[in-house]
């Protein structure tokens, strides 16, 4: 793989974990998967039932989990020689918290974030998997996590916009936006190969868009 550290991003249902796992297996990469299970973040299911009450708790718990995981994983790897692929980029904490928290809570949260993650390496390439909301909802229903089944279209749309707003502000990263609405890289090997080939192209720092 051309890049030593790749982060796959997107909203829930975009296929981040599946793609990251397949690439790590095919390229003998070190895989970092986000820890989101209810036993890791006990506030997650409660948040989907009562967002206003549990938003701050769920975001702070994710912040701590992501920091500890990346600190442990990246600290034991050689970023110049190992190939590392993750199914998230830490900035998703800011994107989700901006959507979920009140303004005063977000201000406090972002201060914590900037302190904690100031020394965590950025990926050489961030890949954003774009799917329209209908595709996302289909995938969410298909995988059947109980706490995700009540997610509304508007919430996914706001998260998508949050990602786009974040991406526009990044001037020092390679970011690849892949529109995967017309392919199925999970079920179709040829589509998966097309995704890998797109990721493995040489990109300058900046934003790049491809429709597959």
Language-model segments: residues:
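Hydrophobic anchor at the beta1->P-loop junction of P-loop NTPases
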Residues: 8
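P-loop (Walker A) phosphate-binding loop of NTP-binding proteins
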Residues: 11
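Conserved lysine of the Walker
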Residues: 16
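Post-Walker A alpha-helix
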Residues: 19-20, 24
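Conserved substrate/cofactor phosphate-moiety recognition/catalytic segment
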Residues: 25-65
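Glycine-rich phosphate-binding loop used to anchor ATP phosphates in small-molecule kinases
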Residues: 54, 58-121
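A glycine- and Lys/Arg-enriched "phosphate-lid" helix/loop adjacent to the NTP-binding pocket
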Residues: 93-161
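NTP-dependent small-molecule kinase module
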Residues: 141-150, 154-212
